[in-house]
A protein has these predicted regions:
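Conserved nucleotide-sugar phosphate-binding/catalytic loop shared by glycosyltransferases and other
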Residues: 32-65, 237, 300-308
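Conserved nucleotide-diphosphate donor binding/catalytic pocket of glycan-assembly enzymes
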Residues: 55-154, 173-174, 178-187, 286-290, ...
Length: 344
């Protein structure tokens, strides 16, 4: 059968959706799977064994009613899909199912305006759901017997060879541990204080003097944050500030060399997890870590304000005050136990 899977979200959400794609291929090995997503994150999914075709939408297309609906119409008129899975089910995505009434399975979310578009509607996100369990629920109308909760990404051997040369040119010894530290975040409300990041970085170095620390950051504000943490660490020689992943695809390649990831919870952590790498993250206040961090055979843990302060007491307090209560001493205690338990 031919499957059209629509996932217009950010990087982390799209990476998590690979559990659904993998499950399709495991249950229907002859499946022809097309993945629809935002153009800017498309390189991350090239060559994925559970994806046969990728269709991208630019920001311009997604934010223009006529361009958006016109392209959705062309997609389902060009090819007939037996199964359409709309993981967002918004006004901006439901055109795929609306323009393809002959598709046997039109699966979407249960919303007030989706009743006449999808012939199989799945409950919206509920308390107790995880991102992975909710994604896999969208396959239940198909009667699949095996649902694979694992997320995955792929890179080529050539990409790894080229990036290995780059790392060595930057002074990295591939025989020694590489610790990737996500020192910043795109959104301020997801960024743990930089001085706390410096504290943990210094503790990681003290624990494993042979470890090589690489910072993950984007250009602009995040790069400035990385430089500030580097300053706070006294320009420690264990930190290789010049090593960069210049794209999401390069970050995926870098992940294959990483021994351990520490940082703010977000898309970078999902990439590490998809490559089977252990991770520990600080979760921003107000987010439930059990929702976003998979519980599978890949070691992963977190520190959350909910462990220190009841959620109802957090209401109304500014983010900087909430983050200040997630002390570096508390986080390091949990990180050290995690490292001990996983032989890191």
């Amino acid at each position: 059968m031919k499957y059209l899977v629509i996932r217009f979200r950010q990087m982390g959400d799209a990476v998590i959706a690979t559990c659904l794609l993998n499950s399709i291929k495991e249950n229907d090995p002859q499946a022809d799977v097309t993945f629809v997503l935002n153009q800017k994150i498309e390189p991350l999914f090239r060559g994925h064994p559970s994806i046969d075709h990728i269709i991208t939408f630019t920001e311009r297309e997604r934010h223009s009613l006529w361009r958006n609906f016109g392209k959705m119409w062309r997609v389902v008129r060009r090819d007939h899909y037996d199964v359409i899975i709309d993981m967002r089910s918004t006004v901006n995505t439901m055109g795929f199912a609306l323009f393809s009434p002959s598709s046997r399975y039109r699966i979407g979310l249960e919303k007030s305006y989706t009743r006449w578009v999808y012939n199989h509607r799945i409950h919206r996100f509920r308390k107790g759901d995880t991102a992975i369990s909710h994604d896999l629920d969208m396959l239940r109308p198909l009667g699949f017997k095996r649902l694979d909760p694992h997320i995955s990404l792929s890179v080529t051997d050539d990409e790894r060879r080229r990036y290995a040369r780059y790392l060595q040119e930057q002074g990295i010894d591939l025989a020694k541990p590489i610790v990737l530290v996500g020192v910043s975040a795109k959104l301020d409300e997801k960024r743990w204080p930089l001085k706390y990041m410096a504290f943990i970085t210094q503790r990681l170095i003290a624990r494993r003097p042979e470890a090589q620390i690489v910072f993950n950051y984007a250009p602009g504000k995040e790069a400035a944050d990385a430089a500030e943490v580097y300053d706070l660490c006294g320009h420690d020689a264990h930190i290789f500030l010049g090593v960069e992943a210049k794209s999401q695809r390069e970050l995926s390649v870098l992940a294959t060399f990483v021994t351990f990831y520490f940082g703010n919870e977000g898309g970078a952590r999902h990439i590490m997890h998809a490559h089977g790498k252990p991770s520990f993250v600080v979760v921003s206040p107000g987010r439930d870590p059990r929702t976003w961090i998979p519980c599978d055979n890949v070691p992963a843990s977190w520190a959350s304000l909910d462990e220190l302060m009841p959620p109802e007491e957090q209401l109304g307090l500014p983010y900087d005050e909430l983050y200040a209560r997630i002390t570096p001493q508390f986080v390091w205690g949990k990180v050290e136990r995690f490292l001990d338990e996983n032989g890191l």
